[in-house]
Amino acid sequence: MTSDSIGDMLTRVRNALAARHPKVDVPASRLKAEIARILKEEGYIANFKVAEEGVKKVIKIYLKYSPNNAPVITRIERVSRPGCRVYVGSGDIPRVQGGLGINILTTPRGVMTGRMAHKEGIGGELLCQIW
């Protein structure tokens, strides 16, 4: 049992990309499904689906690679952790790699990218950065 389920999900994705696996399974939760939805919308993963394996639900994340078999996700980092939460206002949302990457935030209006949160003028907890 891990105390940081989002960190565990990001680590599983990072390890699967390093090993060039076509997909990775992570234990399901609504927050992890929302993070996977954003990754799909932004083009970082090919697809995902929530499936039931026996009693437990899992999220199957289908990873995306470029034509020369390099992972589309160069780096994926956890920012806010259970031991050190990081909250940002709408004006304090950092740019990732000069605008080439994305932030994922959890806000009062749900999970969204840093760009969407800035556009709506809301801040929240900065979960992770991807580029």
Where are these regions (language model features)?
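Core subunits and conserved enzymes of cellular information-processing
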Residues: 1-131
